[in-house]
Amino acid sequence: PKYTIVDKETCIACGACGAAAPDIYDYDEDGIAYVTLDDNQGIVEVPDILIDDMMDAFEGCPTESIKVADEPFDGDPNKFD
């Protein structure tokens, strides 16, 4: 299983992740990205069909704000740093 979360402290609202994976990432009123699957808690497994899109977003994030892990983040984007 794969989980994802956005570090909203480092996100610069560039829009790259939503373009790469619109079924996973969206933006708040300030343009800051979040994971729509679980309101950016990193606790819902990303469906297999969306893994490639998620990895494209992860690799394309200029600030490394998108985090990906094999275990849930429990709301903490820095849990595995």
UniProtKB/Swiss-Prot annotation:
Cofactor, how bound (note): Binds 1 [4Fe-4S] cluster.
Gene Ontology molecular function terms on file: 4 iron, 4 sulfur cluster binding; electron transfer activity; iron ion binding
Ranges where the 4Fe-4S ferredoxin-type domain occurs: 2-30
Residues binding [4Fe-4S] cluster: 11, 14, 17, 61
Cofactor field: [4Fe-4S] cluster
Domain of life: Bacteria
Keywords linked to the UniProt accession: 4Fe-4S, Electron transport, Iron, Iron-sulfur, Metal-binding, Repeat, Transport
NADP is among the record's keywords: no
Xref: SUPFAM superfamilies: 4Fe-4S ferredoxins
Gene3D superfamilies (UniProt xref): 3.30.70.20
Pfam family, one: Fer4_13
Task of the protein: Ferredoxins are iron-sulfur proteins that transfer electrons in a wide variety of metabolic reactions.
PANTHER family associated with the record: FERREDOXIN
Protein's UniProt name: Ferredoxin
